Amino acid sequence: METLCLRASFWLALVGCVISDNPERYSTNLSNHVDDFTTFRGTELSFLVTTHQPTNLVLPSNGSMHNYCPQQTKITSAFKYINTVISCTIFIVGMVGNATLLRIIYQNKCMRNGPNALIASLALGDLIYVVIDLPINVFKLLAGRWPFDHNDFGVFLCKLFPFLQKSSVGITVLNLCALSVDRYRAVASWSRVQGIGIPLVTAIEIVSIWILSFILAIPEAIGFVMVPFEYRGEQHKTCMLNATSKFMEFYQDVKDWWLFGFYFCMPLVCTAIFYTLMTCEMLNRRNGSLRIALSEHLKQRREVAKTVFCLVVIFALCWFPLHLSRILKKTVYNEMDKNRCELLSFLLLMDYIGINLATMNSCINPIALYFVSKKFKNCFQSCLCCCCYQSKSLMTSVPMNGTSIQWKNHDQNNHNTDRSSHKDSMN
């Protein structure tokens, strides 16, 4: 029976049950029987890590079982609960932050412009991921299995989970690129003052971003399936990427480099190019009476450019450890290396850190806007104070019209101070 279990587990590893390059695949396989085993796929082989035995069995690519890690490489239950706490914190902060950001842009007419529309699109993508994917992730961590793994709804979640995760990342990446291009356009046409409203070009960009993000995530929905397997005499099912066609095999082979190139390098390169062009444009137009007349106008645009640049830097910091771990698994790992077990432990820890940081990116943008942008900071304070006042009014049975009056008065007070900048504050 033990040999049969090992063969089944080895077969499972070969078809792709891995500690993956992205949160949805990694979390899927990490949570499935975390107290029983965790599989890790390197460049040429897969590990079967058993946490109930004193040693970890390493199954080389030739199928022999003479090589094994002398020490136990495992994922402790402490990490499971740490990840659960982190996920719950990200869920709360992401819900409040992104929902508040969307409310600010929707309720304040002076905030309805092109760049803010892109920021709202980014926040909505993060909110969808936080609301749908994070609860599934927490369930898997605590229950140790995929939700509804024995019915069709579990299959639906298995395809929806990676699809939404990849779509959310795509929306973030493409919105950051669009914001960088928008900042260059704003500086290049520095004599043009745009009024309130979302330009048609920006609306088309947002629709295109969402459509393209969904299209690029389709292979995830196609490839992820519920795969049954036997382990220690028991039948289990896990959600994983299982290539069943030539296209999916090709996608699985190049996915690491595709994710690194498109979902990480592209927004950084795009920002570097357009911010360099923007800097050159500003240096070439240092003089001129019109520029002096529009000095406050240009100051606002520089502040917005700084805000967008901050969002890109945060994105890079959050996602770099995860992509680095993936590249190391692709390029550094060697099954014949005597220190491969130490490398495995290091990559496991790196995956934990990288996935938590990558997930944190879904809730950190509203916080960054609060500290970087004075206008968003004022709006956040007004909105949150309004909510607190409304809650207090409900507890003390105060009529709700007082709340709306306070919000309107506060908005009127801020409107005068922001009148000179609302035309292009986030333009």
From Swiss-Prot:
- Keyword Coiled coil present in the record's keywords: the answer is no
Tissue range of expression?
A: Isoform 1, isoform 3 and isoform 4 are expressed in a variety of tissues, with highest levels in the aorta and cerebellum, followed by lung, atrium and cerebral cortex, lower levels in the placenta, kidney, adrenal gland, duodenum, colon, ventricle and liver but no expression in umbilical vein endothelial cells. Within the placenta, isoform 1, isoform 2, isoform 3 and isoform 4 are expressed in the villi and stem villi vessels.
Modification Phosphoserine occurs at: 425
The keyword Transmembrane is assigned to this record: yes
Tell me the segments the record calls region Disordered: 406-427
Q: Which residues cross the membrane?
A: 81-102, 113-132, 160-181, 206-229, 257-278, 307-328, 348-372
Question: At which residues is glycosylation annotated?
Answer: 29, 62
Those parts of the protein on the Cytoplasmic side are 103-112, 182-205, 279-306, 373-427
Q: What is its main location?
A: membrane
Location of the protein in the cell: Cell membrane
**Topological type in the membrane:** Multi-pass membrane protein
UniProt keyword annotations, A-Z: Cell membrane, Disease variant, Disulfide bond, G-protein coupled receptor, Glycoprotein, Hypotrichosis, Membrane, Phosphoprotein, Receptor, Signal, Transducer, Transmembrane, Transmembrane helix
Question: Which disease is the protein involved in?
Answer: Mandibulofacial dysostosis with alopecia: A form of mandibulofacial dysostosis, a disorder characterized by malar and mandibular hypoplasia, typically associated with abnormalities of the ears and eyelids. MFDA features include maxillary dysmorphism with dysplastic zygomatic arch, hypoplastic mandible, scalp alopecia, scant eyebrows and eyelashes, severe hypoplasia or aplasia of eyelids, small cupped dysplastic ears, conductive hearing loss, cleft palate, dental anomalies, micrognathia, and limited jaw mobility.
Listed under subunit, the entry gives: Interacts with HDAC7 and KAT5.
What is this protein identified as?
Endothelin-1 receptor
List the source organism: Homo sapiens (Human)
- Lineage, top ranks: Eukaryota, Metazoa, Chordata, Craniata, Vertebrata
Report which gene this protein is encoded by. EDNRA
